Amino acid sequence: MSKVYDWFEERLEIQAIADDITSKYVPPHVNIFHCLGGITLTCFLVQVATGFAMTFYYRPTVTEAFASVQYIMTEANFGWLIRSVHRWSASMMVLMMILHVFRVYLTGGFKKPRELTWVTGVVLAVLTASFGVTGYSLPRDQIGYWAVKIVTGVPDAIPVIGSPLVELLRGSASVGQSTLTRFYSLHTFVLPLLTAVFMLMHFPMIRKQGISGPL
């Protein structure tokens, strides 16, 4: 085993990378509230894992979506647990994200030289809210249907471009199969990909600039 490690160490300098990660200076004023971003990340990883598991059973069609969710909850092995964890972790992710934004704002973490860190964080917050909106529609129940109908109907009040925006969001004039397909694609592919990209920008900037000072 040591020979295998030595082979990788010679080529990749794994130990130097590990030392750099573990030896980062942590300011003395850091407290539990500085962990809110990390908790949000943990919730996101839980969402990815449980969401991926449910894709094996979920069917994104208006005729089968609700029945497939029922199957997950009542017949699939540990399906009720996986969906429950996904649901509660989603709520926790939103809550931790909101608290994290407040903590950063109140401690001045958005000020120079951390403006770009703040901007990427705001984008991640918007993406998190978008996860909630798109995911809410997937069970295709009454609550999800009317929530999506109301949310996608909001742009209709905008002059000139309102109606085209509504049709763009729904895929048609009304909430139907096109809407479910679009929201499923957004929820399972587009939003996770964008979130991963902005996280890969957000974290290195935190690593480079460090944590903002105390109040």
UniProtKB/Swiss-Prot annotation:
GO CC, alphabetical: chloroplast thylakoid membrane
InterPro entries xrefs: Cyt_b/b6_N, Cyt_B6_PetB, Cytb/b6-like_sf, Cytochrome_b_N_euk/bac, Di-haem_cyt_TM
Any one of the GO BP annotations: respiratory electron transport chain
Residues bound to heme b 1: H100, H202
Record keyword Transferase present: no
Gene3D superfamilies: Cytochrome Bc1 Complex, Chain C (1.20.810.10)
Membrane-crossing residue ranges in chain numbering: 32-52, 90-110, 116-136, 186-206
Record keywords: Chloroplast, Electron transport, Heme, Iron, Membrane, Metal-binding, Photosynthesis, Plastid, Thylakoid, Transmembrane, Transmembrane helix, Transport
Family: Belongs to the cytochrome b family. PetB subfamily.
Quaternary organization: The 4 large subunits of the cytochrome b6-f complex are cytochrome b6, subunit IV (17 kDa polypeptide, PetD), cytochrome f and the Rieske protein, while the 4 small subunits are PetG, PetL, PetM and PetN. The complex functions as a dimer.
Protein name per the record: Cytochrome b6
Organism: Drimys granadensis
Gene: petB
